[in-house]
Amino acid sequence: MSISEDDAVYRQRVWREIDVHQKMNLPFTYKAFEDNGNQRFISILLNLIKSGEITAFDATADDRFTTPMTFKQIAEAMVGKPQVLSVPNFALDPDGSKGIMHDTTISQDFNPDQVERYEIKEEWVFDKESSRMHVRILGIAPLKSIYNSDGSFRDVTPIFWVYYPDMRPMLAKYEAYNGKNYGARMSWEELFESRMFASRVIKSTIDNPSDLFINGYIKDPILQLLEGDDMKEKIFNYEQDLWSY
């Protein structure tokens, strides 16, 4: 929905995190192959990027969709650059006694199961023309888990961003899995537009001049959730306060 700048009297941006392990988010993990390929959401994104139907943007630059990425750059962001190792050359030195070595390139394969979360960037706008609050998704980013040297979880970081408005026509062609009724499936566009996903708020523009994520100033996970809920409540209260006058 297009809202003119003059009619947009209130505007906030919100960043959310989707955990694919939550029951409501099971469609994101659906692995079946159908006529148009693998139906897992990360596979759909990668196939659309590889075919040139949508553009991926560098998540290390910003989240404003300014710096396009090549598919090679995406692959390196997901699994790292190939490593060149020096190993014994048993073809020329069968028993290894001569110490003849040769270089070999080791590449890691990308495992779609490693993408366990997604980040959503959205905008909440109050339209004075319709007297309604509207939400529109601006971007989606798959997140990669980062681990410490001892194997413990440290953080997540976006692999790349895709601009959602450009992607909507393509997502309308892919069906999202419905575990409750396989015959009543919806498209991925319908899933996002009807907000059929569970998420938590991880950042907003509300009272945030330093542009910090919640975990940047609140360390306790429970308090982070409460802070995110408070941000949502402030947005909803803006609309309710207008109706109370």
Please report, for each region that a protein language model flagged, where it lies by residue.
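Extended serine/threonine-enriched, polar tracts that run as long, contiguous segments within proteins
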Residues: 132, 137-150, 154
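Generic alpha-helical propensity signal that fires on short helical segments
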Residues: 138, 158, 178-182
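Short linear, low-complexity motifs centered on an aromatic residue
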Residues: 150-166
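Extracytoplasmic
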Residues: 113-115, 135-137, 157-159
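A domain-level signal for the mature, folded cores of soluble proteins
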Residues: 1-129, 147, 165-245
